Regions:
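C-terminal structural segments of small proteins and small subunits
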Residues: 69-96
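Residues within well-ordered alpha-helical secondary structure of globular protein domains
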Residues: 22, 44, 78-81
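Mid-chain, well-packed structural core segment of small domains
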Residues: 50-76
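Amphipathic, charged-and-aliphatic alpha-helical interface segments
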Residues: 39-52
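Alpha-helix C-capping/helix-to-loop hinge sites
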Residues: 27-30, 47-48, 79
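Acidic, glycine/proline-rich low-complexity segments that act as flexible tails and inter-domain linkers
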Residues: 1-38, 60-64, 87-98
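Short runs of predominantly hydrophobic/aromatic residues within well-ordered alpha helices
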Residues: 37-40, 72
Length: 98
């Protein structure tokens, strides 16, 4: 993966960075939902918010956690249903890279 976009936060405010990392660790730890499912949810949310870089990063992390391209697309179907076409256009910008 490329450089962590939060490196600048770590450099400027290490305490804040540690808090963000703790929050991320809590959100993505194995629990009632698998890590794969959590990455798929986060990816769909990024698609809904127009964050194409996040879609790409989270799709790759979901794949690393065992998600198939079909599972990625099904998660995007849910985002499309809830938020409309914008989420699909956001995802389309980056899906060729997974």
């Amino acid at each position: 993966m490329s450089k962590n976009p939060l490196d600048i936060i770590r450099d400027l405010d290490e305490e804040l960075f540690k808090g963000v990392q703790l929050s991320r660790d809590l959100a993505f730890k194995e629990g009632a939902l698998s890590v794969k499912e959590k990455y798929l949810i986060a990816m769909a949310l990024d698609a809904a918010h127009g964050a194409s870089d996040g879609v790409l990063s989270l799709a790759k992390q979901a794949q690393a956690a065992g998600a198939s391209k079909k599972e990625i697309m099904e998660a995007l179907r849910v985002a499309f249903y809830v938020t409309g076409a914008g989420s699909i256009y956001t995802a389309a910008k980056v899906l060729e890279n997974i």
